[in-house]
């Protein structure tokens, strides 16, 4: 019975930590860059795009295809960084539970 109560307490603590992590991920921003800095995409670790910067040299009609490619690349870079930040936060929480490697959430 004591083990069950301990597990319930641990589950409640985990839920509280997960909620705090979700809030933190919403405010944690990463930046993806492409074209040597010609294009940058800022997003939260919850994958919400917050801003896009485009070098004025790319704002020409004949540069549209290049700009499109750079935007896709910068977005992908930002997404990978956001996913890495989320995994890092998850490991910080689930690592304290003593779960085997790869058994965390997400």
Curated annotation (Swiss-Prot):
The keyword Ribosomal protein does not apply. It is found in: Cytoplasm, Nucleoid. GO terms for molecular function: DNA binding. One of its GO terms (cellular component) is bacterial nucleoid. Belongs to the YbaB/EbfC family. Binds to DNA and alters its conformation. May be involved in regulation of gene expression, nucleoid organization and DNA protection. Pfam families: YbaB_DNA_bd. Homodimer. Keywords: Cytoplasm, DNA-binding. It comes from the Bacteria. The keyword DNA-binding applies. It comes from Bradyrhizobium sp. (strain BTAi1 / ATCC BAA-1182). Gene3D superfamilies: Nucleoid-associated protein YbaB-like domain (3.30.1310.10). This is Nucleoid-associated protein BBta_7345.
């Amino acid at each position: 019975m004591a083990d069950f109560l301990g597990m319930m307490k641990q589950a409640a603590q985990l839920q509280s930590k997960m909620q705090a992590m979700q809030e933190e991920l919403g405010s944690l921003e990463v930046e993806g860059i492409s074209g040597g800095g010609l294009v940058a995409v800022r997003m939260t670790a919850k994958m919400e795009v917050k801003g896009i910067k485009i070098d004025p040299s790319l704002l020409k009609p004949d540069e549209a295809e290049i700009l499109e490619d750079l935007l896709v690349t910068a977005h992908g870079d930002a997404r990978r960084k956001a996913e890495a930040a989320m995994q890092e936060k998850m490991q910080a929480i689930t690592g304290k539970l003593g779960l085997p490697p790869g058994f965390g959430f997400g």
